[in-house]
Amino acid sequence: MGQHGAIRLQNEVQEGMPPPHELTEEEQWAEEHRKMHEKHKGHEAMHMEMMVIFMISVIVGQIFLVTWKRKHFKSYQMCTLIGMLTIPVYVCFNRSWYRFLATWLVFCIFSAFIWLKASAQHISGGTPRFVYKWFLFLHKLSYVLGVVGYLIMMGALLGFHVLFGVSQPTLMDAGILFMFYGVYYGVLGRDFAHICTARMASRIGYYTPEGLPKKHLEDGVCAVCGGRLDDSEHVHDADAVVTTKMVEDEDEKLYKLSCGHVFHEFCIRGWVVVGKLQTCPYCKERVDLQRMFKNPWEKPHLFYGKLLDWIRYLVCWQPLIVTAVQGLTTWMGLE
């Protein structure tokens, strides 16, 4: 009798208990992590084989990419651009990240418009400066987004999230989001700028990849855009900025390179900083960037450009290498 009463009391307590609460995102991640450890327990040797395969694949892939870029740069550049445009879009579409897809669509529409202007048979005098200003704006915008994202991430790590009343993972995700948008569109902008730069300069006629201009550059003409320079302006030294003057109703400086050729500010900045062409647009002489950009606040843009070149490998080629390694390990029966 007592045992039956005890059993009835236990059932009543269980029926009166509240239902289990839904797991939070952190708890779900911890549970999945625990299950994965239980599943792969005792597979240390297999995991070591997979790590060796991955390291060898990364090294071989890096050597292949460097050789490909050195031997056939145009095909490497085009394949990289296609990968940069398609791989993140495929991932975001599968995960229903429509905010990125909307920004990607807007970027592609503007880039297509710029490409059409740069590829026209007859390029107007203001088109080159407009194109370079657009890509220089993208470069600076990506730089600002990257810095803001980095500062937000550092604030999350230092505990500043309590000042905004948000959780640390939320603030960290916001920082990563800003940084991703900055570096991704910065890389795409530099690739588009490099393609448009060479194509537009070849249309104007003062530049060819072989270094033999199609027509002679007259004095007082910018070799990038073909626009006139003010002959009355006075050059102070070989690498100094010429006195500010009005160029098409805008205050714009002139730059004179060590080779003696003078260019509009936005033209040479777009050519060197954004277009990644560190040579004179006319005579192919190498440009000394340290002497050209003397102000300390200008040099981070150059370092950021080099960082974007490295990010290109992580965004485009690293996912392909990881996918290939996963396919190889699955074919070999490794888990």
UniProtKB/Swiss-Prot annotation:
It comes from the Eukaryota. InterPro entries: RNF121/RNF175, Znf_RING, Znf_RING/FYVE/PHD. The chain crosses the membrane at residues 48-68, 73-93, 100-120, 144-164, 169-189. GO terms for molecular function: ubiquitin protein ligase activity; zinc ion binding. Its EC number is 2.3.2.27. It catalyses: S-ubiquitinyl-[E2 ubiquitin-conjugating enzyme]-L-cysteine + [acceptor protein]-L-lysine = [E2 ubiquitin-conjugating enzyme]-L-cysteine + N(6)-ubiquitinyl-[acceptor protein]-L-lysine. It is a multi-pass membrane protein. Residues 69-72, 121-143, 190-335 are lumenal. It is an enzyme of class 2 (transferase). Keywords: Endoplasmic reticulum, Golgi apparatus, Membrane, Metal-binding, Transferase, Transmembrane, Transmembrane helix, Zinc, Zinc-finger. One of its GO terms (biological process) is ERAD pathway. It is found in: Endoplasmic reticulum membrane; Golgi apparatus membrane. Disruption phenotype: RNAi-mediated knockdown in combination with tunicamycin treatment, which is an inhibitor of N-glycosylation, results in increased expression of hsp-4 in the intestine indicating endoplasmic reticulum stress and activation of the unfolded protein response. Changing C225A: Abolishes ligase activity. GO terms for cellular component: endoplasmic reticulum membrane; Golgi membrane; sarcoplasmic reticulum membrane. Residues 1-47, 94-99, 165-168 are cytoplasmic. SMART domains: RING. A zinc finger (RING-type) spans 222-284. Expressed in body wall muscles, the hypodermis, seam cells, vulval cells, spermathecal cells, uterine cells and the distal tip cell (at protein level). Pathway: Protein modification; protein ubiquitination. Belongs to the RNF121 family. PANTHER family: FI05221P (PTHR13407:SF0), RNF121 PROTEIN (PTHR13407). E3 ubiquitin ligase which accepts ubiquitin and transfers it to substrates such as the beta-integrin subunit pat-3, promoting their degradation by the endoplasmic reticulum-associated degradation (ERAD) pathway which is a pathway involved in ubiquitin-dependent degradation of misfolded endoplasmic reticulum proteins. Negatively regulates the unfolded protein response to reduce endoplasmic reticulum stress. Required for the cessation of distal tip cell migration at the end of larval morphogenesis. Plays a role in germline and gonad development. This is E3 ubiquitin ligase rnf-121.
